[in-house]
């Protein structure tokens, strides 16, 4: 072997290891820049020496020519579907059938429990460790050849990470698109006047069935393996869970939520845990898959028709349902944004009754081609506001009415305008508009802003409706007599509200900036502004160039801030707030070079009382830390707020330094 071949082999081996750490272990040992440097070095060497190019090189994920169509692949072992359960009773009946069928019944039965990913099932064949073929599930017997497209997925290894690969190994898994990637994909499509996808599953399906793999390579797809088909030249572990861990050890990604459960009660506990975590996972699931863990027991139980007896999918309540669109109302937000809200025939979706859904903006109404009277597909996922994702146009009644976007504000009758390049139309009424005034005041008192506990949305609505307050400063001028005259406001409640207002006068500069409600200035940006300028006067006097020196403040946000301080009304409100006693201490954050967190990996868990999670994350990043979402042996610190859960427990198990919120704040300030 020549020196060049040895160098190429070493580069490929190193890059495969880094890909494994990044995509499978979620624990990279080097920064992205180092991977990129080695990748480009390998690519340059391969261009200089094409005679040594191999098909399993990390550089060869993309390169196949577009296909004229997909050829068919017959599955040597059929890819079966699963029976479904929709209630605890149906799951318990499944367990009873297993217990009745087994000759020697282990006590308790052990299950391998997995999230049921909402993607596309695929089969990937490795021959002597090299990816040679991939197919869709199809009808279970025959699928489409998607080898070129599967090769483009970054977490799918082109070469297994083992020196002793099986002669043939068929990996079965689910390809899906995480939420973050889906949002980026649709954002790009909107910016380039391309068609958007209705949901991540459709996006994943459309991406896998591209005839041009170069297009697929630009789509943020992910594989999670859930089983093994063909296995030749290897002694596989004797349990399903151990097989998944073995796959992980040779470079195949598996889902991190997989758990072993003993007995039906533990399995049902897993089902509820995953259901509660569903909205925070970052990808779509529609239930759990529950499998007998022991392979010998699986073989004993066998199959019925097209499903195994040893596994079942326990589905979550439906997240999508059909209903009728009865009307559309237009609501006004604190920045004047006009949002169309669909008034629906009430329908039970994902555990709750839904009667309203957002239609986002005029473009969305046009895209959906929706009319009052239509039958619509409503989707509700976790805590996300229900939305209409489709229309059954073939069911449109003759008396359907078009949705007319208003030209004047439905609250104050001011003109509605839409700035070129923006999707949102806005009322021009400003604080003259009662709706904007209410929402601006609700934002001002919210937990992440001034955190005024005793003053809620309903109280603000009464105060605005009765013309008792017009600006945030007016809140601090309220007295007991005024408050006790309001509906449902007794003396005790009024005293609590006044005490909350008094306590809120002592705040932080970051919270105060966020509370002002400047467009596109979220809590993280407010924190960056406070840390950069140190004082309100310095921020107020900053020019556009100075504003753009703040992290995460670009030209658009800088303009918003600059214009805010050039409005005499805004300056007057701020001065009035200061006059009413609103104040803060000047806290200097330590420079990145002199703090405990520089170049460290930090995990946040629990509820922080002094700042929001995003605020803390932005602060840590400014200090030079890497903020991770999961605890591992590479974690340096865990900052634990109230009600910290499994991350705190894992940190203690791994002897990782745990800081309270107070200890964290003491470390970063002086």
From Swiss-Prot:
Its EC number is 6.5.1.2. It catalyses: NAD(+) + (deoxyribonucleotide)n-3'-hydroxyl + 5'-phospho-(deoxyribonucleotide)m = (deoxyribonucleotide)n+m + AMP + beta-nicotinamide D-nucleotide. Signal peptide: none annotated. One of its GO terms (cellular component) is cytosol. The active site is at residue 116. One of its GO terms (molecular function) is metal ion binding. Keywords: DNA damage, DNA repair, DNA replication, Ligase, Magnesium, Manganese, Metal-binding, NAD, Zinc. Its cofactor is Mg(2+); Mn(2+). Zn(2+) binds at residues 409, 412, 427, 433. InterPro entries: BRCT_dom, BRCT_dom_sf, DisA/LigA_HHH, DNA_ligase, DNA_ligase_AS, DNA_ligase_CS, DNAligase_adenylation, DNAligase_N. GO terms for biological process: DNA repair; DNA replication. It comes from the Bacteria. It is an enzyme of class 6 (ligase). NAD(+) binds at residues 32-36, 81-82, 114, 137, 174, 291, 315. It holds the Pfam family BRCT. Residues 592-670 form the BRCT domain. Belongs to the NAD-dependent DNA ligase family. LigA subfamily. DNA ligase that catalyzes the formation of phosphodiester linkages between 5'-phosphoryl and 3'-hydroxyl groups in double-stranded DNA using NAD as a coenzyme and as the energy source for the reaction. It is essential for DNA replication and repair of damaged DNA. HAMAP family: DNA_ligase_A. NCBIfam families: dnlj (TIGR00575), PRK07956.1 (NF005932). This is DNA ligase. It comes from Haemophilus influenzae (strain ATCC 51907 / DSM 11121 / KW20 / Rd). The gene is ligA.
